[in-house]
Amino acid sequence: MMSWQTILAIGSGGFIGAVLRAYLNGLISHKLPHDLPYGTLGVNLLGSFFMGLLMAYFMYTSVFSIQAKSFLSTGLLGALTTYSTFAIESLLLLQGGHVFLATANITLNAVGTVFMAGSGFYVGKFLTHS
């Protein structure tokens, strides 16, 4: 059973992450062409990098409390990244007959987020062992 402090940490992190996602998504989407959902891709790549970085810190240090870990990972980064939006945007591209763009979106999100999580993890591992 989670403590009320952990639940509050997740909720407050989620609030900040959701607002940050909306802001960054709008900022990225405004600056780039609208043929591909770059805003969603951007927040997913960014969030995956920081999740990897945090996982390394969580594994190799004891600096973070359970509430801090929950705030940052499940709350903030969980709300910043968005699998459901990625899925619906890919579906809409397919329904619109944009098979190449849908395939590109799916590939960039799937491969890109794993790459960014791995990159973040190795940066975090390097930083904790320096």
What are these regions (language model features)?
Residues 1-130:
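Membrane-interface helix-loop junctions in multi-pass transporters/channels
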